[in-house]
């Protein structure tokens, strides 16, 4: 599933081609996504794009009379095309722009979403979200406060959007490795120093992935059709049985809430 770095990479890739241009029309080939494509999107015509923003794993296209909310789901990606190209099986949505560009949404598993709202505030998919991990609000003090009475393992707690948004399976595993914290540790057992370190490394890991265009393991592509290259830098995720890059101990795989977790027994305590 695309996580925060992949969504932010998509935002940065499409923004220069959309902002200041006008949506001539939308071409919906298959509107049966996780939720049906909103009727308002079908009716788009001569609509300027004012901004392209991100909240958690949602892309937000600001229009004069409302917002398009895009979620990439499990396998979605957005590409900018310079000219019309024949659509393939999983190309479900096109936004045809006045500058000759086409924003194409591809989603083999159709777990993504294209929604419309007049106002962002209070929309159900954006309500009850925690802070952005790259914001000043997310820091060691905040993390310690939220972990203090939490009797659950730290790995699934990091993936809870009520705590912090956008830290999915890949980056939770990678951040815990970078901080030397075992994923099974109770959140409440983390010291102030460990919370400070973990908050810092989460930011560092996410920023490094954004610099590399995100992580492509299967479906994700950047807006220019290229894969993300952070997969080459993964320390533990997806490396079950391979030697730890630090100590050589085989990487272990386990599960938390049916999600794979990877860690090093020697480096993480």
Curated annotation (Swiss-Prot):
GO terms for molecular function: 8-oxo-7,8-dihydroguanine DNA N-glycosylase activity; class I DNA-(apurinic or apyrimidinic site) endonuclease activity; damaged DNA binding; zinc ion binding. InterPro entries: DNA_glyclase/AP_lyase_DNA-bd (IPR015886), DNA_glyclase_Znf_dom_DNA_BS (IPR015887), Formamido-pyr_DNA_Glyclase (IPR020629), FPG_cat (IPR012319), MutM-like_N-ter (IPR035937), Ribosomal_uS13-like_H2TH (IPR010979), Znf_DNA_glyclase/AP_lyase (IPR000214), Znf_FPG/IleRS (IPR010663). Its cofactor is Zn(2+). DNA binds at residues 90, 109, 150. The keyword Nucleotide-binding does not apply. The keyword Zinc-finger applies. The active site is at residues 2-3, 57, 259. Keywords: DNA damage, DNA repair, DNA-binding, Glycosidase, Hydrolase, Lyase, Metal-binding, Multifunctional enzyme, Zinc, Zinc-finger. Pfam families: Fapy_DNA_glyco (PF01149), H2TH (PF06831), zf-FPG_IleRS (PF06827). Binds 1 zinc ion per subunit. One of its GO terms (biological process) is base-excision repair. A zinc finger (FPG-type) spans 235-269. It catalyses: Hydrolysis of DNA containing ring-opened 7-methylguanine residues, releasing 2,6-diamino-4-hydroxy-5-(N-methyl)formamidopyrimidine; 2'-deoxyribonucleotide-(2'-deoxyribose 5'-phosphate)-2'-deoxyribonucleotide-DNA = a 3'-end 2'-deoxyribonucleotide-(2,3-dehydro-2,3-deoxyribose 5'-phosphate)-DNA + a 5'-end 5'-phospho-2'-deoxyribonucleoside-DNA + H(+). Gene3D superfamilies: 1.10.8.50, MutM-like, N-terminal. Its EC number is 3.2.2.23, 4.2.99.18. Monomer. Involved in base excision repair of DNA damaged by oxidation or by mutagenic agents. Acts as a DNA glycosylase that recognizes and removes damaged bases. Has a preference for oxidized purines, such as 7,8-dihydro-8-oxoguanine (8-oxoG). Has AP (apurinic/apyrimidinic) lyase activity and introduces nicks in the DNA strand. Cleaves the DNA backbone by beta-delta elimination to generate a single-strand break at the site of the removed base with both 3'- and 5'-phosphates. This is Formamidopyrimidine-DNA glycosylase. It comes from Salmonella arizonae (strain ATCC BAA-731 / CDC346-86 / RSK2980). The lineage of its organism: Bacteria, Pseudomonadati, Pseudomonadota, Gammaproteobacteria, Enterobacterales. The gene is mutM.
